[in-house]
Design a protein with these regions (language model features):
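N-terminal assembly/interaction segments in proteins that build large macromolecular machines
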Residues: 1-131
Length: 131
């Protein structure tokens, strides 16, 4: 239904419709930013060779989302990204091009997860270890 609305608002232009959908997704994520995240999970990732490791806390509003395989996959993907890119802090991480798709930032990737669940999702903290 939302795709139909996007195409109608873009007068059939697929490129403009995609831009409209992205804008709607950002607005959706912003509208959820004031909600409380009281659930979530801890993800631990150890890179092959055992010399780099990451632990992170990815939070959600409900356990329904935090137990979902897509949410768990997102936590794992962000942990792998942190292992590969060594960001200094959360703000720097969210601005980095996402390692699996450089056309989007890590923040944009997390916003796409927000859109799929309709809940606020927040990267609360992370730590990267390297020997």
């Amino acid at each position: 239904m939302i795709c139909k609305k996007a195409l109608e608002s873009a007068e059939g232009d697929e490129t403009k419709a995609l831009e409209w959908l992205k804008k709607q997704g950002v607005e959706m994520a912003e509208s959820k930013s004031q909600r409380t995240t009281k659930d979530g999970l801890i993800e631990a990732y150890i890179h092959s060779g055992g010399r780099v490791g990451v632990i992170l806390e990815l939070k959600s509003e409900t356990d329904f989302v935090s137990k979902n395989p897509l949410f768990k996959e997102a936590a794992h993907n962000v942990a792998m990204h942190i292992a590969a890119s060594s960001p200094e802090n959360i703000d720097a991480l969210l601005q980095q091009p996402y390692i699996k798709d450089a056309s989007v930032t890590v923040g944009g990737y997390l916003n796409s997860i927000v859109q799929k669940f309709g809940e606020k999702i927040e990267l609360a903290r992370f730590e990267r270890f390297e020997i």
